[in-house]
């Protein structure tokens, strides 16, 4: 779920305010996304969007009325390491790994302030 993704990003980047920092960044960070990613961070978001699209195609996710933004899962954070719980079902595990990989990606690439609230005409 979105609030868990927020927590994962805080785990990897404790100084961040994920919903403020990463929402409406570039062409893909935030709801929706199209065009060409503007940088590596935007590519992290594009990959995350594609991961959620794959999750929605899984049979184990089809029974859910929810979508990946609201479907919750179990994970833990210790010493900046994110672990998805083995108790997650197949769908939860998939979404957890989408979020985990994106949080790791965010922590490994530069943040360019000029790409925050980017006019989508540049996408």
Curated annotation (Swiss-Prot):
The keyword Secreted is assigned to this record: yes
Role, per record: Secretory calcium-dependent phospholipase A2 that primarily targets dietary phospholipids in the intestinal tract. Hydrolyzes the ester bond of the fatty acyl group attached at sn-2 position of phospholipids (phospholipase A2 activity) with preference for phosphatidylethanolamines and phosphatidylglycerols over phosphatidylcholines. May play a role in the biosynthesis of N-acyl ethanolamines that regulate energy metabolism and inflammation in the intestinal tract.
A Pfam family it matches: Phospholip_A2_1
Subcellular location: Secreted
PANTHER family attached to this UniProt entry: PHOSPHOLIPASE A2 (PTHR11716:SF94), PHOSPHOLIPASE A2 FAMILY MEMBER (PTHR11716)
A Gene Ontology term for the protein's cellular component: extracellular region
Reported modifications of this chain: Activated by trypsin cleavage in the duodenum. Can also be activated by thrombin or autocatalytically.
Protein name as it appears in the record: Phospholipase A2
Similarity-based family: Belongs to the phospholipase A2 family.
Record-listed E.C. numbers: 3.1.1.4
């Amino acid at each position: 779920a979105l609030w868990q993704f927020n927590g994962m990003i805080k785990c990897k980047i404790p100084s961040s305010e994920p919903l403020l920092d990463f929402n409406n960044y570039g062409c893909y960070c935030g709801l929706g996304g199209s065009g060409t990613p503007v940088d590596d961070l935007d590519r992290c978001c594009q990959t995350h969007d594609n991961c959620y699209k794959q999750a929605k195609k899984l049979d184990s996710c089809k029974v859910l009325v929810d979508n990946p933004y609201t479907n919750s899962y179990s994970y833990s954070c210790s010493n900046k390491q994110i672990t998805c719980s083995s108790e997650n079902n197949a769908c939860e595990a998939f979404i957890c790994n989408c979020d985990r990989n994106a949080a790791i990606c965010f922590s490994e690439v530069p943040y360019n302030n000029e790409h925050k609230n980017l006019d989508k005409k540049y996408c």
